[in-house]
């Protein structure tokens, strides 16, 4: 009996992974608004009914499919928060590498989750929490910079929020479907923008 239960559990996990894999592949070329349960299940060769044994709806599917990516984003946030970005371009560049790597690996899925957030309150709340954490970390990082302290912007909190939203929009545009440019170019571009704000007049190239 125990063996039978284990086989059933393994079979359910296999089916769930098959559905997640199909959806992950489809969002490379399909927006969330265009994605349908029928299309996902057609990719798996399984019936529509089976989908609802595992997921409530497409938003639920994306949340589960994106769990790894979201966990990696939180880890990237931690790395950004610990980076000594007041030290200059190399430190800023290193701070961005983890987040750029996450978007490089999971860009289409993160784009689909962002699109789904426009229509799903739970997903929207989750995205807002991630954005706020990044904005808070950005503000704390900027506040500790001597050049910012000497010549502060009119509203440091809003500057941090604007930089964070720019980061997110740029990364989603660059990696939301097939990668448009190399990750190294993205890292350097973000480094140059942040250097212009945090260390005006200083070079953003590697030291």
Set out the residue ranges of the language-model regions.
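Amphipathic alpha-helical linker/stalk segments
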Residues: 3, 29, 65-93, 111, ...
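Helix-turn-helix
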Residues: 14, 18, 26-60, 64
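Short hydrophobic clusters on alpha-helical segments that form packing/core surfaces
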Residues: 15, 19-27, 73, 99, ...
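An amphipathic alpha-helix signature
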Residues: 20, 93, 97, 132-143, ...
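Short helix-capping/turn signature of helix-turn-helix
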Residues: 55, 115-120
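Hydrophobic alpha-helical connector segments
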Residues: 60, 64, 78-105, 151, ...
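Hydrophobic alpha-helical bundle segments that form small-molecule/ligand-binding pockets
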Residues: 83-85, 105, 120-121, 131-163, ...
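Helical hydrophobic small-molecule/effector-binding pocket
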Residues: 89-114, 129, 133-140, 164-165
């Amino acid at each position: 009996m125990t063996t039978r239960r284990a086989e059933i559990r393994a079979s359910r996990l296999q089916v769930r992974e098959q559905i997640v894999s199909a959806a992950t592949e489809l969002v490379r070329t399909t927006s969330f608004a265009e994605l349908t349960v029928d299309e996902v299940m057609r990719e798996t060769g399984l019936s529509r009914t089976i989908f609802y044994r595992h997921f409530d709806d497409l938003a639920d599917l994306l949340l589960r499919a994106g769990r790894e990516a979201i966990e990696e984003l939180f880890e990237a946030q931690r790395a950004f928060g610990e980076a000594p970005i007041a030290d200059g371009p190399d430190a800023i560049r290193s701070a961005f590498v983890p987040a750029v790597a996450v978007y490089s690996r999971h860009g289409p899925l993160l784009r689909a989750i962002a699109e789904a957030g426009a229509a799903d309150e739970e997903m929207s709340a989750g995205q807002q929490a991630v954005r706020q954490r990044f904005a808070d970390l950005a503000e704390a990082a900027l506040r500790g910079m001597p050049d910012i302290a000497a010549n502060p912007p009119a509203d440091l909190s809003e500057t941090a929020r604007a930089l964070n939203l720019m980061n997110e929009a740029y990364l989603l545009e660059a990696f939301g479907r097939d990668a448009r440019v190399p990750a190294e170019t993205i890292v350097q571009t973000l480094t140059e923008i942040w250097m212009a704000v945090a260390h005006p007049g200083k070079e953003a190239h590697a030291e």
